[in-house]
């Protein structure tokens, strides 16, 4: 690793101590280490830290030649290439990162489930991803919440290494008496800051974009407790929550891209491949630690053999030490021992040379020989190696699940309820009389009540009334532009009538050269005659004119002309009058009904003649 400043190192240490950020914290922090609201940790002179048991598991065996080491950035020290990893930290704690041309995003999982799947894979190497998902149900996020992704979608994600998981806040209904209730949010999605979530909800309430919600309060202490108050007791809790899930971070999506470094090269791996790579790594760690321990035992046995020779010839050893000028060489020649054994004998204290010491050394020798034999068998048997890996994983599982608060699954799984949100939102909107006013200069507003008096309506200097329409606040308004486009506005979303309103071009994308030629309340089954100045027209049902896009919908192809007729169908005959002062009358049923287009020729014109206004 290249050198980092103390600030980035401390920020990383803080994150590893936050149980709402890391599923299995690797740092045990003492002091203020931040919170889920996004508040910063205290400066490092005010905090203390130590490794957790999970971190110790990751490092277990590091000093026993379990992994390779390499020179560090400055080449003045060595660092491990990988850690021994007594538990599968990559899956349990997840990982996110970005590099040049690639990125990784791995969600955290429950250690007990992952370890159970790994041990099952040892016993059943041909197990499929579906088999492994009997143990690994899905991600397990530190902040809990509810995962509403289908099993099929998660299976595909774990097979390919790419996918995503929809996360929702966990909530419950609390009865407040007299038929009323409030919703309590107890868990929020992973990596969502509570303070920002509340800020967003407040903004949406102020902008009147949450018609089903009346108020939101934060009553959190150590645990999350957000109180959501419905606008009316008739609002169904499921409907209210579905509307909030679509509007803010009470629902988020965690994208999975299991792009990992395997044997030094990046590749996207599925769940089974990641587990197989981890298990092979653990088997290698077991073998290397066994070889390291075997080497230590051989060296110790070599010394013990020398000690035993000394005890069998204790009087001679003492004489040599007292009388000879070169006692080491004399002992080597006299007893046939090695230089190392002779040096060890010379380093013994004379007062330790007693019968009891001999018995202890013989006992130690016997135990080490037995351990050596077991290690030799382990190194020579793949089956024994896998058995050891499985036992070690079982021990790690027991250690990580000893505390239920850490070990138990936090994230739940549910199916998203089938809710007709559009109908519920429509039913919740208050129905009040409004008069929609459009001025000649293009300012629009919704004035309360019907029966508008044009003389009492105020406009900007030089402006005047152009179009008006009496509607209800739950209605939709259709605006027809001279270029043939149709726009839809919600009556209750229009600016109020106290001021002059706002320019219509803030609500719809209207070019400066284009004007509004008609404005009316949408009635789905009502029909209208549409005609352009070049003499073409057709009949359209108003429902076909509705559009949710700010750019509107191209309903009429006006050709070289403009739209100048948009009138409701009445009677059974149609009279067409041009600027040439000629009139043509024909049955209305001869005009085609279309959803969009140019229509039929209504009347032929020459030169500059057009359809009359």
Predicted regions and their residues:
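C-terminal interaction appendages of subunits in large macromolecular complexes
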Residues: 96, 102-613
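Catalytic phosphate-handling regions of large nucleic-acid enzymes and associated NTPases
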Residues: 1-164, 227-229
């Amino acid at each position: 690793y290249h050198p980092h400043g103390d600030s980035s190192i401390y920020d990383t240490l803080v994150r590893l101590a936050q149980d709402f950020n890391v599923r299995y914290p690797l740092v045990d922090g003492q002091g203020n280490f931040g919170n889920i609201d996004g508040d910063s940790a205290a400066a490092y002179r005010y905090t203390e830290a130590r490794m957790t048991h999970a971190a110790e598991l990751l490092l277990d065996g590091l000093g026993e030649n379990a992994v390779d080491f390499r020179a560090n950035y400055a080449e003045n020290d060595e660092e491990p290439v990988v850690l021994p990893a007594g538990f599968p930290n990559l899956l349990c704690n997840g990982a996110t990162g970005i590099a040049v041309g690639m990125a990784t995003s791995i969600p955290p999982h429950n250690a007990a489930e992952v370890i159970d799947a790994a041990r099952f894979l040892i016993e059943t190497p041909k197990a499929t991803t579906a088999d492994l998902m009997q143990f690994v149900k899905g991600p397990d996020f530190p902040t809990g919440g509810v995962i509403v992704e289908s099993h099929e979608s998660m299976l595909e994600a774990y097979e390919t290494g790419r996918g995503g998981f929809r996360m929702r806040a966990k909530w419950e209904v609390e009865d407040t008496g007299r038929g009323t209730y409030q919703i309590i949010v107890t868990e929020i999605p992973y990596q969502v800051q509570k303070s920002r979530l509340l800020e967003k909800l407040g903004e949406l309430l102020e902008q009147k974009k949450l018609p089903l919600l009346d108020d939101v309060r934060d009553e959190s202490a150590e645990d999350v407790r957000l109180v959501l108050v419905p606008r009316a007791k008739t609002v169904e809790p499921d409907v209210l929550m579905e509307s909030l899930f679509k509007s803010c971070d009470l629902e988020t999506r965690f994208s999975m891209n299991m792009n990992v470094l395997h044997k030094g090269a990046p590749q996207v791996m599925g769940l089974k491949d990641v587990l197989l790579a981890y298990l092979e790594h653990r088997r290698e760690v077991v073998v290397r630690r066994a070889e390291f321990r075997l080497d230590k035992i051989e060296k110790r046995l070599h010394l013990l053999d020398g000690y035993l020779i000394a005890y069998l010839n204790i009087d001679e050893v003492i004489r040599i030490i007292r009388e000879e000028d070169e006692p080491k060489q004399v002992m080597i020649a006299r007893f046939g021992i090695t230089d190392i054994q002779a040096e060890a004998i010379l380093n013994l204290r004379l007062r330790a040379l007693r019968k009891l010491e001999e018995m202890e050394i013989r006992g130690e020798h016997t135990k080490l020989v037995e351990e050596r034999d077991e290690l030799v068998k382990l190194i020579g048997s793949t089956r024994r190696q896998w058995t050891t890996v499985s036992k070690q994983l079982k021990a790690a599982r027991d250690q990580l699940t000893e505390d239920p608060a850490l070990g138990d699954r936090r994230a739940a799984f549910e199916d998203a309820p089938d809710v007709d949100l559009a109908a519920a939102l429509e039913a919740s909107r208050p129905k009040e009389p409004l008069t929609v006013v459009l001025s000649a200069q293009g300012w629009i507003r919704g004035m309360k009540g019907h029966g508008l008096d044009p003389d009492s309506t105020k406009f900007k200097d030089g402006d005047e009334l152009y179009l008006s329409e009496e509607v209800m606040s739950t209605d939709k308004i259709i605006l027809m532009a001279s270029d043939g486009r149709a726009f839809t506005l919600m009556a209750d979303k229009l600016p109020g009538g106290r001021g002059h309103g706002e320019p219509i071009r803030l609500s719809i994308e209207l070019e400066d050269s284009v004007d509004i030629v008609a404005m009316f309340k949408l009635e789905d089954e009502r029909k209208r005659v549409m005609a352009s100045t070049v003499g073409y027209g057709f009949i359209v049902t108003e429902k076909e004119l509705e559009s949710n896009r700010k750019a509107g919908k191209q309903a009429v192809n006006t050709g070289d002309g403009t739209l100048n007729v948009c009138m409701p169908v009445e009677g059974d005959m149609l009279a067409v009058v041009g600027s040439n002062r000629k009139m043509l009358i024909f049955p209305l049923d001869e005009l085609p009904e279309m959803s969009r287009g140019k229509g039929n020729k209504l009347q032929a014109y020459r030169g500059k003649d057009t359809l009359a206004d």
